[in-house]
Amino acid sequence: MTKPIITFNNVSKTFEDSGTQVLKNINFDLEEGKFYTLLGASGSGKSTILNIMAGLLDASSGDIYLDGERINDLPINKRDIHTVFQNYALFPHMTVFENVAFALKLKKVDKKEIAKRVKETLKMVQLEGYENRSIQKLSGGQRQRVAIARAIINQPRVVLLDEPLSALDLKLRTEMQYELRELQQRLGITFVFVTHDQEEALAMSDWVFVMNEGEIVQSGTPVDIYDEPINHFVANFIGESNIINGTMIEDYLVSFNGKEFESVDGGMRPNEPVEVVIRPEDLQITLPEEGKLQVKVDTQLFRGVHYEIIAYDELGNEWMIHSTRKAIEGEVIGLDFTPEDLHIMRLNETEEEFDARIEEYVEMDESEDGLINAIEEERNEENL
């Protein structure tokens, strides 16, 4: 990893008036030029992290570093960080030009330089020619672009975005996701984005921090977070999941619904209780006799790109299936899946415990492979 641009070291936050602890020992390093997302439900602590990073809130304990310099006591205007707020915080009585140029005027930048940089920045956010437009006459998407232009005109090291797309309609929000991601990659500025929208986080980010009750419960690439959730909360929060109680018989063999199935997971105790995750899109509908499981279709909804089918097995477990084929309500169908479609989770395992287990398991696996290779080499020498 390259030198981090921002570091949180055991950062906690408790509001003194209520005694409520909203952050618990937050630790992370952010690299320069990447798109990070803090993802969580309302009250999870994600906006508190953003406000501490910006200097709008003080941490109760722990250290915050920018480029290796401790900034806990550094004033907001001394931090090379800019925030785009949910309500955009634009000046309604000013024009687009005046809003974007505001920070440069405070720094007493030359008028010609201001005009040049405002024009360049508005072009970046596709608002060229809007310089004299009143803020009050702009659409929601246009106001969003003005707020972003104002944030990047000073070329800060870090841009913080506090749910800036939440007020936009679905189509415009999707368009802005593409624009924000493309802009961040073009500028090479570190973006830290806050959202409760899982699809938004997965679509835009290089790295996602999933938060719950003031803690980071899992962090990783969008693919890691989606394909390898470490516990029930993450699996249930990120996308749709079928989560079934099971037993890990041994490495690569799991039991649930009274049957044994091959898997690709290992490193757990023999006969350890586990939870099995199968994503709805990984379940294939078959004839009942051809399926690994049999379920009875209860209801279905057409979602445009697929049917969302709810079915129940004989044990009463609910199954969600995404299929391009329409099912018949009341019909018994088979469900097929591969070992790779099963993700096995230990009960209540933390990210630290998960990482330690995987590291130990990989080392053990490599050691066994080395022993097998040594035995085979010895046999080959004896045969010569």
Swiss-Prot record:
Please indicate which superkingdom the organism of origin belongs to.
Answer: Bacteria
Q: Which UniProt keywords apply?
A: ATP-binding, Cell membrane, Membrane, Nucleotide-binding, Translocase, Transport
Q: ABC transporter domain: from which residue to which, for each copy?
A: 6-238
Q: Which amino acid positions bind ATP, per UniProt? A: 40-47
Under PROSITE patterns, the record lists: ABC_TRANSPORTER_1 (PS00211), ABC_TRANSPORTER_2 (PS50893), POTA (PS51305)
Q: What is its EC number?
A: 7.6.2.11
Instruction: Output the Pfam families linked to this UniProt entry.
Output: ABC_tran, TOBE_2
The UniProt entry, under SMART domains, shows: AAA
* Stated name of the protein: Spermidine/putrescine import ATP-binding protein PotA
